[in-house]
Amino acid sequence: MSQAQYAGTGRRKNAVARVRLVPGTGKITVNKKDVEEYIPHADLRLVINQPFAVTSTVGSYDVFVNVVGGGYAGQSGAIRHGIARALLQVDPDFRDSLKRAGLLTRDSRKVERKKPGLKKARKASQFSKR
């Protein structure tokens, strides 16, 4: 007999995370590595656990994540978004608390492209009047 699995996809910046929740002990595995090994920053690991804290389900589910693209911050945000979406499948009553915490909203900010003639996206060389 197979256990119930809940899936969710999260995105942030250039990162895309495919998340599976399985009832368990709260172990988080990212790209077949433990989360402490994969994401070295403790504050980013707190970001990943936010959906569980908001819904009072800390330690209730094992999380299996496959994440590609972006850096540590983008991937952590994508994992958080995916976990929040997967928790909606667990219990639709979580929607109100997750929405209030802003965890279901896709953060649409992306890196602005560099423009020709400028040094960066908006930084120009110093203007000389004469």
Swiss-Prot record:
Entry-linked HAMAP family: Ribosomal_uS9_B (MF_00532_B)
Organism: Streptococcus pneumoniae serotype 2 (strain D39 / NCTC 7466)
GO BP terms: translation
Keyword set, alphabetical order: Ribonucleoprotein, Ribosomal protein
The protein's name: Small ribosomal subunit protein uS9
GO cellular component, one term: cytosolic small ribosomal subunit
GO molecular function, one term: structural constituent of ribosome
Coiled coil: none
SUPFAM superfamilies noted in UniProt: Ribosomal protein S5 domain 2-like
Statement: the UniProt record of this protein carries the keyword Cell membrane: no
PANTHER family: RIBOSOMAL PROTEIN S9 (PTHR21569), SMALL RIBOSOMAL SUBUNIT PROTEIN US9M (PTHR21569:SF1)
Protein family according to the UniProt entry: Belongs to the universal ribosomal protein uS9 family.
InterPro entries named among the record's database cross-references: Ribosomal_Su5_D2-typ_SF (IPR020568), Ribosomal_uS9 (IPR000754), Ribosomal_uS9_bac/plastid (IPR023035), Ribosomal_uS9_CS (IPR020574), Ribsml_uS5_D2-typ_fold_subgr (IPR014721)
Biased composition (Basic residues): 111-130
Pfam families hit by this protein: Ribosomal_S9 (PF00380)
Ribosomal protein in keyword set: yes
UniProt cross-references to NCBIfam families, sorted A to Z: PRK00132.1
Disordered as annotated region, ranges: 106-130
